Amino acid sequence: MTLLEVNNLGKHYNGDTKVLKNVNFEIGSGEFVSIIGPSGAGKSTLLRCINRMVEISEGSVFVDGQSVGDMKKKSLRTLRTNIGMIFQHYNLVPRLTVIENVLHGRFGYKTNLQGIFGRFTEKEKEKAFELLDRLGIADHAYKRCDQLSGGQQQRVGICRALIQDPKIILCDEPIASLDPNSSKIIMDYLKRITNELGITCLVNLHQVEVAKEYADRIIGLKSGEIVFDGPSNMLYQDKIESIYGFQQRELITV
């Protein structure tokens, strides 16, 4: 079943600067897909178009059969409960506790007043603790997030995404700020999310070898265009070199 459909997607700024050009692909339920490409290829912009954090200039994006670009504010807010986001720099509130940050993932289901006053149900709180336990950080539930390591903070970010009950999680360079051991822990958890919960994961990565190890499928972006889309075991060295060019020598492996 197709969960995400991107058709002739284009994004440009100031009229002329084209960041994405004629991007087309489909992703099914339960797939683990990685997007690779050099800095400036358009990877982050692509994820932000899917979630409509930035407006689409051309083409269309469908999530679970619904056109993201045509949605009004209320409908878009509802759709976003099905789209989890994980960010490179965690996007947590440092002064709040771990459990509070996780529960922020339920804001899409709340009225503005409920969100402001932190009115969460006992069931939601129980779910938050279950997720923290699943990711091995339940003991830190009442610590401030700025007291955690980077890897621990990213696990909080994963819990916050999961408590939304999403159908797809968009991960924007989730291990770029982490050491090798923490990176492996995060990637292992993301893979388990797909395998055990059936949640689709679309993961931007700069580390090609990590993408090949974890992803079922890889999409290669270069200058805003798709130049590779296929199984990870079909991404050969010549194609990697064509995607990254002179940057290929500087690629990070974990």
Curated annotation (Swiss-Prot):
Pfam families: ABC_tran (PF00005)
EC number(s) per entry: 7.3.2.2
Subcellular location: Cell membrane
CDD domains the UniProt entry points to: ABC_PhnC_transporter
The UniProt record lists the keyword ATP-binding: yes
Residue sites binding ATP per the record: G37, P38, S39, G40, A41, G42, K43, S44
Gene Ontology MF annotations: ABC-type phosphonate transporter activity; ATP binding; ATP hydrolysis activity
Domain of life: Bacteria
Coiled coil region boundaries: none
Family annotation (SUPFAM superfamilies): P-loop containing nucleoside triphosphate hydrolases
Domain ABC transporter positions: 4-248
Membrane topology: Peripheral membrane protein
Reactions accelerated catalytically: phosphonate(out) + ATP + H2O = phosphonate(in) + ADP + phosphate + H(+)
Family annotation (NCBIfam families): ABC_phnC
Assembly, per entry: The complex is composed of two ATP-binding proteins (PhnC), two transmembrane proteins (PhnE) and a solute-binding protein (PhnD).
Family the UniProt entry places it in: Belongs to the ABC transporter superfamily. Phosphonates importer (TC 3.A.1.9.1) family.
Name under which the protein is recorded: Phosphonates import ATP-binding protein PhnC 2
Species of the source: Oceanobacillus iheyensis (strain DSM 14371 / CIP 107618 / JCM 11309 / KCTC 3954 / HTE831)
Taxon lineage: Bacteria, Bacillati, Bacillota, Bacilli, Bacillales
Gene: phnC2
